[in-house]
Amino acid sequence: MSRPARWSLLAGLPLGIVASALLWAALGPLAPASREEVFEIPKGTWARRMAGDKVEILPNNVRLVLGVKDVLVLRNRDDVPQIFGPTLMMPGQSFRLPFQVASTYQFACTAHASGQMTVTVEPGPSAGWERLAWRTRAFMGPGGTT
């Protein structure tokens, strides 16, 4: 192989690596380590709330993505039962709620300061540009920077 051909090959190697990474990001499967989004209600939450503390242990809106993080898990570590939707969670119990339809859901939640929690389930990104953009946003974080 001639010297110019070697240099062309070496110069094209980084471009090929970048192109391969972009292709994988756009078309590669979504395989998270766990599809669960876990929240814990810590011990003493109810007592603090009854004492007048504004306890913010759960977000107002939980965002899930079908096929990626589409299972909500609540763990009650408190000393008293907690209600989430139609479910009564006794102390030490966990509640697992898988979602299969993209939508916005409202639940009664005694562990939440407002008594309500919203779960927004977004559709999973389809292969191609949409998945590439989704992975880029996930990599960059909420503020758009790493």
Predicted regions and their residues:
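Extracytoplasmic copper-binding redox domains, predominantly the cupredoxin/blue-copper superfamily
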Residues: 2-146
